[in-house]
Amino acid sequence: MKTSDFNYHLPEKLIANYPLNSRSSSRLLVQSTTIEHLLFKDIINFFQQGDLLVLNNTSVIPARVFGNKESGGSIEVMLERVLEENKALVQIRSGRSPKIGSNIILNSLIVKCIGRQDSFFILQFDRSPIEIFNAIGHVPLPPYIKRPDEELDRHRYATVYEDKTQQDSVAAPTAGLHFDNTLLELIKNKGVNIATVNLSVGAGTFQPVKAENIEEHDIHSEYLEVTPEVVDMVLETKKKGKKVFAVGTTATRALETAFMDESKKGFCGYTKLFIYPGYKFKAVDRLSLIHI
């Protein structure tokens, strides 16, 4: 299957650089046997009592930091994940890659580049990387949003159901940005069960697919946790003939990874699951994707 088969034209004027005041007033396209153009709040009409809605409760780290190399050249550091108490795996954008053993200055803080791992770099900090990025980091807006991050993004580039103790993602699970508390309560009152999984969205989510054939793409790995209780909820939902709705590709990747194991006892670890046309879904019946 050619990667070019997935190309399409997206005019820049159709990209919303700022969110609407009301999360659930965003536009919603529904594809089944027909295509409908609705508002996101209308998604409630597609749920039935006994269905299951699965959310990714991850929280976003302000994962982008700007600084300079020892030579004075500018540098951009994008956190991928924390490796140890004071070490992190990062992407680096610069005219020239930093040398192993060299220092990088981030907002007057000196960190050391101590190694490489494929296209990523390993940096050593003098304290917790999460603490540092929370203090001086910028919200990592998607590359298609052509503006600097602002204070409002710390709130709006996050879901209303995020778990602050799960601050482990460098990008938001964007399909969930359009649920507000009122809509979630209405869905719950309709008799829909709600479950959460956790998948740490990595910087690889921003990497383009360069392989000529989609099957040859080396997709990035991500850490996830799906509890045995959530697996049981999925199994019970299907047993009753009801539907499992996953909010976004991250929740989908988490659930489908958990159901790759025949024991179906939950999953905790890294996944490289790559879903493309032809994949047979084991857990998810309905998928809610990114919305405009």
Go through each PLM region and give its residues:
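A cross-family signal for N-terminal binding/gating loops and helix N-caps
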Residues: 1-290
